[in-house]
Amino acid sequence: MSFAASLYEKAQPIWEAGYNHPFVQGIGDGSLEKSKFQFFMKQDYLYLIDYARLFALGTLKGNDLQTMSTFSKLLHATLNVEMDLHRAYAKRLGISAEELEAIEPAATTLAYTSYMLNVAQRGSLLDLIAAVLPCTWSYYEIGVKLKGIPGASDHPFYGEWIKLYASDEFKELADWLIQMLDEEAKGLSSKEKAKLETIFLTTSRLENEFWDMAYNERMWNYNG
């Protein structure tokens, strides 16, 4: 079993909980309230800005031209594919470009992005990959599962979201990261692998916190 496959196996209970979250299920059956999705898209827009920064940092940390090129492609896809989807949904939801740029991060968004940036800046290229991979990989899995629900990808509002994350193009992004992880992890000690596992499982859990934040439209638990 490859190292990435072993991480995938250990993360399955977390990812299953994410897929079964009422936010995700609401996208699948079309019942999710628009206000919850709007909250999600605003916070996810902020998230993607920092996610793009992580890919830019990956380009800097790359040890060879191929790695640098791969992270450059991931950066481009985030800025010009995922964020375009968010801007298109924002327009449909009546959110102006100015409003998008002025969004304040919720506590969960801040915790999630700060954790990844801290790991990536202080750690190695492998640490960075372990931090960003759960988002891309689990989103593709969710997209494929939701696409398997009859009529889900044809939904007039949520269908485009499902189709993007279930696409072959998005799978390619996840595959690049998986392949890099396995290649870079060759020869690591058990201790080094355990560190990467902790990072991978932590960001997997933070993904679920993000779904829950959006479903409850929660900025902060305490606003005093």
Swiss-Prot record:
The keyword Hydrolase applies. The record marks 47 as: Increases nucleophilicity of active site Cys. One of its GO terms (biological process) is thiamine diphosphate biosynthetic process. It holds the Pfam family TENA_THI-4. Pathway: Cofactor biosynthesis; thiamine diphosphate biosynthesis. The active site is at residues 135, 207. Keywords: Hydrolase, Thiamine biosynthesis. It catalyses: 4-amino-5-aminomethyl-2-methylpyrimidine + H2O = 4-amino-5-hydroxymethyl-2-methylpyrimidine + NH4(+); thiamine + H2O = 5-(2-hydroxyethyl)-4-methylthiazole + 4-amino-5-hydroxymethyl-2-methylpyrimidine + H(+). Its EC number is 3.5.99.2. GO terms for molecular function: thiaminase activity. Substrate binds at residues 44, 139, 165. GO terms for cellular component: cytosol. Catalyzes an amino-pyrimidine hydrolysis reaction at the C5' of the pyrimidine moiety of thiamine compounds, a reaction that is part of a thiamine salvage pathway. Thus, catalyzes the conversion of 4-amino-5-aminomethyl-2-methylpyrimidine to 4-amino-5-hydroxymethyl-2-methylpyrimidine (HMP). To a lesser extent, is also able to catalyze the hydrolytic cleavage of thiamine; however, this thiaminase activity is unlikely to be physiologically relevant. Homotetramer. Belongs to the TenA family. This is Aminopyrimidine aminohydrolase. The gene is tenA.
